[in-house]
Amino acid sequence: MTTSAAASVAEFSDHATTETLATLLHDWAARLGDEIAVTFLDYRTSDDGRAGFLTWRELDDRVSAVAARAAELAAPGERAAVLVEQSADYVVAFLGAIRAGLVAVPLFAPNLPGHAGRLTAVLADCDPRLALTTAPQLDQVREFVDPKRTELVAVDLVPPAREREWPVPEPDDLAYLQYTSGSTRSPAGVMLSHRNVLANARQACAAYGAVTGRTTTVSWLPLFHDMGLVLGIAAPMAAGIGTTLLDPVAFLESPGRWLRALSASPGAISAAPNFAYGYSASRVSEREKSYLELSRVVSLINGSEPVLPSTIAQFQAAFGGCGLDPAVHRASYGLAEATVLVSVTDAGEPSRQVAFDRDRLAAGAAVPAGSGASSTLVSCGHAAGQQLRIVDPEKRQAVPDGKVGEIWVRGENVGRGYWRNPTTSAETFGLRLDGTDGWLATGDLGVLFDGELYVTGRRKDLVIVDGRNHYPQDIEQTVEAHPAVRRHSAAAFAIPLDEGEGAVVVLERAKNLADGEANLTAAAEGLRAEVAARHGLKLTDLVFLAPGEVPRTSSGKISRSACRARYLDGAFADRRLS
């Protein structure tokens, strides 16, 4: 990082005991005034993306107005759910809650398809005193909250506020709850303090080269997503840089919109899951490319799901002719429990790719491949201002470089635990290693090779498709509720695909399901539709087995790992219905 970048990020860091994202906003508003802080490209009302702007001063004034109203209705430390569509109003609502001393809960508008179950579960878990939304969403929000327990505020209707004093939190007071599970039954809210988010925002700014007056962030990631929130709100507040936001749907409808926003934003820093880079490369036309100027892009972060070498190459081949420098690709690793960012590749250098011996890697050793089968992994670089170790999770001891183990992290960015879940918190946070406390067990597997982190898999059984996390037990419960499926027989897992990861379910048919391909095909169609409706997930494959054929452990539990291994070995090839 350059000296000027470091100075820019650190300039407003002298009073760490009272800093929040909202106090930083006030400082930048005093300094930057009428410069643009937030740009939202609205493709809901205009095919061309009507641009709306908030200056630093306007943003600060609107945040104060929302905070003043929020403070009338809720006490410091109570929760404020943010139920706003992707927009500048979302930024206002989130920062308004923080300025009022409330614990923000970044969520989404109730009209987001396929998420009603999750919204209901999260609202029940966080028990908000306040729901921040916009006027068009008020009626829908009322269907999800108890008016006796939760007050509603339309942030776009709040009048200006008079000057007043705001609560001064301690650094370790909660700033927000980052919900991670996507489950409709067991949501997990990571407790993140002001210290946590400011530490990680500054770690990100330092790693990505954010410089006041010279860089901007560009993001279509959901603002309720950990990466979207830090990139779209926290990092800009830390460094005093503008942000340009798009709705995720706008990107999915036409990925060229993201590329045009990058082209129009000098010094652009952006991030996306691996799938988005391949999606963009295959969907942006040559005509669209002719209008792009990408030579001023500073960093393109690739994270949130496994980074594939083929995708990086595909994206660079597609847009290299538009001036895109291959050195801007930054493979990254992170998780919500560490706010978001843990490690990233060095600036100005293409990400390292190493072909490891596949069998040795599966056995726990990272050895460059010879003539045998190989697995090529992309380096996720070095820890970003925090400590990182590879650990034997059973012995809780660090392992040597070149050995696969669980990734453990320690730093000021690591959260306090899971909201109202002390048991799981104690298993994950504040662990002891090498004589020091405060370590986070990530549940992910990786290896340090030549000093850089390579993520090899997941100790947890998360299924990650298109950048979204799905817990397999949730998918399994949905599948097992179908009358064609034997109870307690389904195994859901991820498999590698050329464009990322796919989701597979292997299950046992119910004993009363009549034999015949037509019956199985009809059942499979119903199951696919149910999984898509409940989880927003398109299954790559669905396999019906006879009762008793799904692999189980000695205690009778379904063994996802054994099932996945047999699937990848082709043991179920003749049972596929896809």
Task: Describe each model-derived feature in a short phrase.
Residues G33-I36, R162-S186, N196, N200, ...:
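Conserved pre-ATP/AMP-binding loop-to-beta segment of ANL
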Residues V38-A74, E78-V91, L112-T120, V168, ...:
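Conserved AMP-binding/adenylate-forming core of the ANL superfamily
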Residues A131, S263, S270, G411, ...:
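AMP-binding/adenylate-forming catalytic core of the ANL superfamily
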Residues N200-T216, D226-A268, R283-R287:
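Conserved AMP-binding/adenylation subdomain of ANL enzymes
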Residues G267-A271, R283-A373, Q387-R389, K395-R396:
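Gly/Ser/Thr-rich phosphate-binding loop
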Residues D359-L377, Q397, V414-G443, E476:
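Conserved ANL (AMP-binding/adenylate-forming) active-site segment centered on the GW(Y/F)…HTG consensus within
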Residues A365-H382, Q387-W408, D450:
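Conserved beta-loop-beta connector loops within the AMP-binding
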Residues S489-F493, V504-V505, R528-S578:
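Conserved C-terminal "lid"/linker of ANL adenylate-forming enzymes
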